[in-house]
Amino acid sequence: MDKKYKLWNYKYDFSEINLKNWKEVLKDTFKLNTRKIALLSMLFAIEILMTIISKVIMGLAIPMIVGVYTIEISFFVILIIYLCSNYIYASILSITAIWFRLLLGSEPVGLLSMMISDTAFLTIFAVLFFILKKFIFLKFKFKNQIKILIALICFAGLISMIGSGFISMLCNDKFIFEMYYLSDDGSGYWKMLLWVGFGVTLAKYSINILLFASTLKVLLILIKQSRV
């Protein structure tokens, strides 16, 4: 079969899947080789490093907001892992990195909340980005593909952060705050906490999407050259 790769010059992107090539697409997407394992290991190490930086340096620069929320800058590495591999591998490494924070003194309830938020964002982002690539990026020819990809990433990121924000609000309202022994006394503090959390979620993912988008051009070159 004459292969015509549309995004990468050496493999299928998952968004290129159809009834004829699905076996090859799944193989290209999920098969682990020495290069891919080495790359994922390196990126996971960078994620852990960024986690430590977020925990120590950012924790000192930006203390807990209203005693509950923090802003982390390590999630963009998970998006890089997603771009280099797939949603499943990115999710596994994301959850592993989140619970690694226990060794840095983070408390479990906050990590549970972070896991819900990050997993929700990554899931929505992966679905939206797949749809946008399949029905826009791969359907039409663009002079500047990098700019189009960045625009699609920003759009998918915007929808994902809003979705993740509302999911986090719902979880906070239903059980997360109760695990902090907080209660709604009718004073308005409960609702204020919920909306502050929504704002913090938007701020966190906005920063990480910008970091991810700013590195996209270099990432695409490195991925194509490394052929992972």
Curated annotation (Swiss-Prot):
Primary location: membrane
Keywords: Cell membrane, Membrane, Transmembrane, Transmembrane helix, Transport
Compartments where found: Cell membrane
Domain of life: Bacteria
UniProt keyword Membrane present: yes
GO cellular component: plasma membrane
Induction summary: Expression is probably regulated by riboflavin, via an FMN riboswitch.
TM spans (from-to): 37-57, 61-81, 87-107, 111-131, 148-168, 192-212
Membrane topology of this protein: Multi-pass membrane protein
Physiological role: Probably transports riboflavin.
Protein's UniProt name: Putative riboflavin transporter RibV
Gene designation: ribV
